[in-house]
Amino acid sequence: MALARCVLAVILGVLSEVARADPVLHSPLHRPHPSPPRSQHAHYLPSSRRPPRTPRFPLPPRAPAAQRPQLLSTRHTPPTISRRCGAGEPWGNATNLGVPCLHWDEVPPFLERSPPASWAELRGQPHNFCRSPGGAGRPWCFYRNAQGKVDWGYCDCGQGPALPVIRLVGGKSGHEGRVELYHAGQWGTICDDQWDDADAEVICRQLGLSGIAKAWHQAHFGEGSGPILLDEVRCTGNELSIEQCPKSSWGEHNCGHKEDAGVSCAPLTDGVIRLSGGKSVHEGRLEVYYRGQWGTVCDDGWTEMNTYVACRLLGFKYGKQSSVNHFEGSSRPIWLDDVSCSGKEASFIQCSRRQWGRHDCSHREDVGLTCYPDSDGHRLSPGFPIRLMDGENKREGRVEVFVSGQWGTICDDGWTDKHAAVICRQLGYKGPARARTMAYFGEGKGPIHMDNVKCTGNEKALADCVKQDIGRHNCRHSEDAGVICDYYEKKTSGHGNKETLSSGCGLRLLHRRQKRIIGGNNSLRGAWPWQASLRLKSTHGDGRLLCGATLLSSCWVLTAAHCFKRYGNNSRSYAVRVGDYHTLVPEEFEQEIGVQQIVIHRNYRPDSSDYDIALVRLQGSGEQCARLSTHVLPACLPLWRERPQKTASNCHITGWGDTGRAYSRTLQQAAVPLLPKRFCKERYKGLFTGRMLCAGNLQEDNRVDSCQGDSGGPLMCEKPDETWVVYGVTSWGYGCGIKDTPGVYTRVPAFVPWIKSVTSL
């Protein structure tokens, strides 16, 4: 009985719908929407009570069989006929309350769960026009209600579309193309006057396309053939439809089809970039998309090639790095650091970089860019992209040029401050520039692209200075050219507080990071301010470096006694250089001072390595010999009989000695562990005494040693108070970097009373 009642109720309901059907369209009579919530309909229940089921969609009414052929024969009708939306025409795309319809391809789950077979024609359709599936019933569409849920509603197509109908033409995909509007019965284009990304954002939103909206000009996707319908479109980017944007009247313009506007609505994927916070679309803070969130890029190691790649990926031809202070501040995450692009990347994340989110930066170091199209006349970096490599910061380094797909260097023949001025100008720096020669920032590894570059100092770019064929040279990488930009800023910060300089020892005022002699790497300028060198005067040769040394005060230097074995202890034969970094390039903090006195330990014998220690008094008046600065500071002495193996950590050796290939021109540094006394005794037997210590990394693949050119140089260790103490003087060893043969050093704590008695320190 219950089943019979249910069947009867269904039949009566169907008959009721047929009785209420419109005699012309055979569709349910019009009713306003959205209807007030009604508890009997699951679709309108509050979300907390709503069962997980498909909304009740408008099903086609069951018409008498005799009338069905008439329905099937209905053809597309013009928009002047009331309440008609042709099955293939772009008429209505909003509900009868003016709510925009969703695109049919945005709601496939609902279509898949809907029973009528005629609805299959709507699946995957990339438009939002109202439809009557199968030609039955009133046209309707999906929309999103006030609660953000997918709903459906009827359309009234009598006046054509409630929102302008838009399509993209000429692109490689449905996400890009020339913008065309349907108006007054025909398709037409938009003029690109004042067309920008804000306009593109509205177009993409109206088309239901998410992602990055970008405006394109000058008929980028080809010229249209219909009328030009709109001009001077000025959207803010927040509008739901282009109809809401300020614009010219329909059909009013002063353009040709060469100015047809286009857009691209690129899907958001990891690595997509944009410019944000600028006053126009071609400038701003560089931001990259990752895991659903935009973030910034740190400028550590940022080069002109990175700028070129970023601007090219954004659709521009050229660009320059800009101060991020010109753009709005950011509170977004810093996604990328140490980015390095080669110029061939098709995506920004193909550039070399740190892992996502790994950085040591603040937002003050965000990359800012200004990009320019080819037609703008703003080509600020013409010719060869350039970059600075292996400097202490982005304002200095070895000059490298990108030619024929490969980075290479410039030979320093004739290289002067005028050349440096041009390089720095091309990179966007305005301060004084200084040239550096003789591979001051290390030797490059690629080809040498240029030689005999001729600059007057007034050129805008390096390309204006090249007079010789690319690739033609007679140089080696030991002659690679470099520059320092904004030079005065570095110099004025270099003198420090006079009270601190005169009263302290063991202070490293300029070290910022540690790179790692054999197993070592270039140090930073001024990072080891007590490093000195003992040099022969020209009467005994070419003034070459003889030994390393350690500055103990303005007038006293510590070194090894064996340094005087060959040329004797005549003070007039030697000079001491402090504040040096590159042995062949004069620098502002460098001082070369004559020797007044040489004091060799009385127990030293030339045929032995014991007591291998000496003191050198510099020429000067009173206690003022070397001028102290951030690059010239004394080291601290240890306590008498102090055991560095127990009290010291973080030990380093420094010098200009053997690097494993040749003697270095730039100061080297290497971290070494202090080794147990018993190990050294077992290895060197009776040659190792209590006045010695040994240090070095003994692993086969990571051996670090101090070699011939570093004789007399310091072995420094850091104490808990962050001061540095000289615990050793480089003395002797078996070869350089040979397995199980650590370097041997004179143990300075054993000689503290002698040092103080000689120097009165």
From Swiss-Prot:
Tell me the GO BP annotations in alphabetical order. exocytosis; proteolysis; zymogen activation
Residue span(s) of domain Peptidase S1: 517-760
**Which Gene3D superfamilies does the UniProt entry name for this protein?**
Plasminogen Kringle 4, SRCR-like domain, Trypsin-like serine proteases
A Pfam family this protein belongs to? Trypsin
Principal location: secreted
What EC number(s) is this enzyme filed under? Answer: 3.4.21.-
Q: So which domain of life are we looking at? A: Eukaryota
Bias type Pro residues, positions: 54-63
Q: Name where it's found.
A: Secreted
Which segments carry the region annotation Disordered? 26-88
Region (Zymogen activation region), start-end ranges = 505-516
List residue numbers at the site (Reactive bond homolog): 516-517
Disulfide bonds, paired cysteine numbers? 85-157, 101-141, 130-155, 191-255, 204-265, 235-245, 298-361, 311-371, 341-351, 411-475, 424-485, 455-465, 505-636, 547-563, 651-717, 680-694, 707-736
* Domain SRCR positions: 166-267, 273-373, 386-487
Active site per UniProt: 562, 612, 711
Q: Which InterPro entries does the entry mention?
A: Kringle, Kringle-like, Kringle_CS, Kringle_sf, Peptidase_S1_PA, Peptidase_S1_PA_chymotrypsin, Peptidase_S1A, SRCR
The Kringle domain sits at: 85-157
Q: Listed GO molecular functions?
A: peptidase activity; serine-type endopeptidase activity
Name the UniProt key words of this record, in alphabetical order.
Disulfide bond, Glycoprotein, Hydrolase, Kringle, Protease, Repeat, Secreted, Serine protease, Signal
UniProt lists the family membership as follows: Belongs to the peptidase S1 family.
Q: What does this protein do?
A: Plays a role in neuronal plasticity and the proteolytic action may subserve structural reorganizations associated with learning and memory operations.
Could you tell me what this protein is called?
Neurotrypsin
